[in-house]
Each structure stands twice: as structure tokens, then as C-alpha cells.
From Swiss-Prot:
Pfam families on file: F-box, FBA_3
Superkingdom: Eukaryota
Start and end residues of each F-box domain: 22-71
PANTHER family in the record: BNAA05G37150D PROTEIN-RELATED, F-BOX ASSOCIATED UBIQUITINATION EFFECTOR FAMILY PROTEIN
Name assigned to this protein: Putative F-box protein At3g10790
Coiled coil regions in record: none
One GO CC term, this protein: chloroplast
InterPro entries recorded: F-box-assoc_dom_typ3, F-box-assoc_interact_dom, F-box-like_dom_sf, F-box_dom
């Protein structure tokens, strides 16, 4: 509507102002937005999901996520950090990120959060895989979590026949861009005389799949899980200790093909499984009477090839 007063025209027509006209970042080219996000920490990036649709579409894009993880992975090689989970059994579960040497105040953080709705339930945690962790609580629930953003998702309960306990392992298939959880179920009646646990049922859960359920898979290798064993993921394969034909062995599960294989371990007996760069290594435990740490590195699983070196550790008595 317009009114004419003398030679002036007064208009009171409302003009809709969009966010892109008020926010200078909305008109920024896509590659510049991605460049800015690449320099931010994951916890800060997660807040952009609520900022606007354009920023959310970038953050939730799989190509951007994969590129971000690759960049942060190579950065972490020069700035390794520790992730600790502490349960005080009275307040809540807390995660601690260790400090970086360059900026001790920037990377250190304490995050208090619950992987489930019951904070006083204890959890076993698997080693991180691309920033995510797999948790198992004492009510046999498997939980996938992001400790950086404190987001957790409980997977469907593992349906078993007569088996009581479950042992989950976590991995990633880079070809199909899929996270998978390998779960083995056992029962007390399947404990062997030596105390090892017989693996009977093997199931796989694929994160992000439309059918949110566990799938039964076949394992032709009869093996016994070593008590307290913890799986290690590296280059598309989950590794864990087990006994095969009464011999301590290294089991391999290829996440993509969902196939099992076994690697003979070097002698003498090894007791620790760890990542060694982009490879897998096994070591012995250090005792007061033992001053040598033997490290074996798996060079080629298909050829059963290992390399090794020895580290002389000062006597604990002299420290």
C-alpha cells in the first residue's frame, strides 16, 4: 500500500529478508566452507548441524566426513593422544582426552556422559575405530558411541538360544563405507577345562543398514576365545587372540568379506595385542624378573610372516 504526500511516495510494503542476505557465510563458496570446517575440532563441527541447512548438509555428507577423518588420522600420527574412560560408580561415566604437546589446553577435555540411561552400569570398551567406540555393558547390550560429541546408540539386543554371554568386536569396511560389529555368543557350559571360552554363534550387525538386526554368519574354524581378549582393528581386519587346536593363535576377521582365518603366533608365548603404525604387533608382558620386551610385527598374514625386535628395559628394582 502506498500513500502520496506532496512529491514523496511512502511505501509500507514488507520485504522478506532471507538468512542468506543477513549471514555473509551463507553466500560463501562450498570449497571455502569445507576448508574452514577441516580446521575445526570434531566437537565444534557437530554444532554446525543446527546452524543451517546448508552447513548441516556439508557436515552430514559422507564424502566430507571421510575426508575429515583421513586428514585427522594423518595429523594424529604426529600428535598421538590417549582416550581414557573412567567410571566413578557414583556420578557418571567420564572420558578424558590427553593433551597435545603443541597446545596442552586446547585438546584436553573431560566429557561426562552416559552411554545408556543407567549411569551405574559398567562397560567394556573396544579400541576406537575412526573416532567411534564399541561398548558392552553388564546387561549384554552393545552400544556404539562417539566420545567427542557424547552421542551413543544402543544396538538391538542380541537374540541367542541358550548362550548367556556375548563378546563384540568393532571394525570398518572402507570399500562399502560400512561399520560392522562382530558378536560371538557363548554359554557357561561351553567353558573348556583350561578356562578358555568356546565361540559358538557368530553374528554381524551393520550400522546404517535399513534392516536393523543381527545376521548369523558361518565360521568354519573352531576356536576358543582367550579370557579378557580385546579385538584390534587394522586395515579392514579385526584381530583377536584365540586357541585353535590347543595352540594360542591370532584370529583374523575380514570386515568386508566377513571371512575368518587364523595366523600362527611366534614363540615364546605372547600376551599383548597392539597396533604398530598401520600394522599389528604382539608382545610379551613385563615382569619384575623379566627385563626384555619382545615385539613381533605381522608383516603378511596370508604368508604367516613376522618380523621382530627386542627392547631392553631397565630393571624395575633400580627405578
Amino acid at each position: 500500500m502506498e500513500e502520496v504526500k506532496g512529491k514523496r511516495t511512502i511505501s509500507n510494503t514488507w520485504k522478506l529478508v532471507t538468512r542468506s542476505q543477513t549471514d555473509p557465510f551463507e553466500g560463501m563458496p562450498l570449497h571455502l566452507k569445507e576448508k574452514i570446517l577441516m580446521k575445526l575440532k570434531a566437537k565444534i563441527i557437530s554444532t554446525f548441524i543446527l546452524l543451517s541447512k546448508s552447513w548441516s548438509s556439508i557436515v552430514l555428507n559422507k564424502d566430507f566426513t571421510n575426508m575429515y577423518l583421513i586428514i585427522k588420522f594423518f595429523e594424529s600420527l604426529n600428535r598421538p593422544r590417549l582416550l581414557l574412560a573412567v567410571d566413578d560408580r557414583e556420578i557418571n561415566m567420564q572420558f578424558f582426552h590427553s593433551c597435545s604437546r603443541e597446545d596442552p589446553s586446547s585438546d584436553h577435555q573431560t566429557v561426562g556422559c552416559y552411554p545408556d540411561s543407567y549411569p551405574r552400569i559398567w562397560y567394556d570398551f573396544s579400541p576406537p575405530v575412526r573416532g567411534l567406540i564399541c561398548c558392552l555393558n553388564n546387561s549384554t547390550k552393545v552400544v556404539i558411541g562417539n566420545p567427542t560429541t557424547c552421542q551413543f546408540e544402543t544396538l538391538p539386543r542380541v537374540r541367542t538360544k541358550i548362550y548367556q554371554e556375548i563378546f563384540p568386536f568393532f571394525g570398518y569396511d572402507h570399500v562399502k563405507d560400512e561399520y560392522k560389529v562382530l558378536c560371538m555368543t557363548i554359554s557357561d557350559e561351553y567353558y573348556s577345562r583350561s578356562g578358555n571360552i568356546v565361540s559358538k554363534e557368530h553374528k554381524v550387525f551393520t550400522l546404517g543398514c535399513k534392516q536393523k538386526k543381527w545376521r548369523m554368519i558361518e565360521c568354519t574354524i573352531n576356536h576358543y576365545l582367550t579370557p579378557g581378549t580385546q579385538g584390534i582393528f587394522s586395515n579392514g581386519v579385526i584381530y583377536y587372540f584365540a586357541r585353535v587346536n590347543d595352540d594360542q593363535s591370532l584370529m583374523c576377521f575380514v570386515v568386508g568379506s566377513e571371512k575368518f582365518s587364523v595366523v600362527e603366533l611366534p614363540r615364546p608365548a605372547v600376551e599383548v595385542l597392539a597396533n604398530y603404525g598401520e600394522k599389528i604387533a604382539v608382545t610379551n608382558l613385563l615382569y619384575a624378573s623379566n627385563d626384555r620386551l619382545f615385539v613381533w610385527i605381522l608383516e603378511d598374514a596370508s604368508k604367516q610372516e613376522w618380523s621382530n625386535f627386542c627392547v631392553l628395559v631397565p630393571s624395575w628394582v633400580d627405578i
